[in-house]
Design a protein with these regions (language model features):
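A glycine-rich (often HGG/GG-containing) alpha/beta subdomain
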Residues: 1-146
Length: 148
């Protein structure tokens, strides 16, 4: 199971940050980071649920945020996937990433790994994956249009 910050954050942070998790242990990760209190998440796929995020080792509150659950195969990667929408301060982001990295069988994704998993699971074809890369890297209006 992998995780990564999906939001491009400036050094000063932002209002909101999104962290994605994908893989077989995604529900375990949700349970750990919410201390088993992600009420209704399984019954409400693709709907935002407000949750407290805690460090499972200390029970310390990290943040309050929205959790979205996308069960396989109807997710970007074709795997179980969730998004944690948190406040975008660097302190909150760094704590969440640190805690996720300490959960068993959960590791930081390599660059492009979410898209590679989508490609391998038949959710995208190669041209679409290249288009996503080009769109992410687009700096001009012309580059944005070509990527789409």
């Amino acid at each position: 199971t992998i995780f990564a910050l999906s939001t491009n954050i400036k050094s000063s942070g932002s209002a909101i940050a999104v962290i994605r998790v994908s893989g077989d242990k995604t529900l375990n990760v949700i349970d750990e980071i919410t201390n088993g209190k992600a009420d209704g998440i399984r019954e409400k796929p693709r709907q935002a649920c407000l949750n407290d995020y805690v460090d499972p080792k200390t029970n310390e509150l990290i943040d309050k945020g929205m959790t979205l659950w996308f069960p396989r195969p109807k997710s970007y990667t074709g795997e179980d996937l969730c998004e944690f929408h948190i406040h975008g301060s660097m302190a909150v982001i760094n704590k969440m990433l640190s805690v996720l990295g300490n959960i068993n069988d959960c590791r930081l994704a390599r660059e492009g790994e979410f898209t590679r998993r989508a490609l391998m699971n038949g959710k995208l074809h190669l041209i679409q994956a290249e288009g996503i890369r080009d769109l992410i890297n687009a700096r001009t209006e012309n580059q944005r249009r070509r990527a789409l």
